Amino acid sequence: MRKDIHPDYRPVVFLDTTTGYKFLSGSTKASKETIEFEGETYPLVRVEISSDSHPFYTGRQKFTQADGRVDRFNKKYGLKDANAAK
């Protein structure tokens, strides 16, 4: 096995710039910034979106109803739903 071909894997603090949420994780991401977190100094990586601010994880997701081809055809030609007439 060759030596010195793998990047340095170490603990890094990620900072969500949207909410200010910080979390510690292992990463190979390099950073010149450092931060004090839980009494230790770690490299700091700033991210725009994390699980603290992403709409999927926060529940603020907007769902859109995708109409099917039949529904679009019926809307286009003004046809009523056959099941609704019964």
UniProtKB/Swiss-Prot annotation:
<keyword id="KW-0689">Ribosomal protein</keyword>
<dbReference type="GO" id="GO:0006412">
    <property type="term" value="P:translation"/>
</dbReference>
<dbReference type="GO" id="GO:1990904">
    <property type="term" value="C:ribonucleoprotein complex"/>
</dbReference>
<comment type="similarity">
    <text>Belongs to the bacterial ribosomal protein bL31 family. Type B subfamily.</text>
</comment>
<comment type="subunit">
    <text>Part of the 50S ribosomal subunit.</text>
</comment>
<keyword id="KW-0687">Ribonucleoprotein</keyword>
<dbReference type="Pfam" id="PF01197">
    <property type="entry name" value="Ribosomal_L31"/>
</dbReference>
<dbReference type="InterPro" id="IPR042105">
    <property type="entry name" value="Ribosomal_bL31_sf"/>
</dbReference>
<dbReference type="InterPro" id="IPR027493">
    <property type="entry name" value="Ribosomal_bL31_B"/>
</dbReference>
<dbReference type="InterPro" id="IPR034704">
    <property type="entry name" value="Ribosomal_bL28/bL31-like_sf"/>
</dbReference>
<dbReference type="GO" id="GO:0005840">
    <property type="term" value="C:ribosome"/>
</dbReference>
<dbReference type="InterPro" id="IPR002150">
    <property type="entry name" value="Ribosomal_bL31"/>
</dbReference>
<dbReference type="GO" id="GO:0003735">
    <property type="term" value="F:structural constituent of ribosome"/>
</dbReference>
<protein>
    <recommendedName>
        <fullName>Large ribosomal subunit protein bL31B</fullName>
    </recommendedName>
</protein>
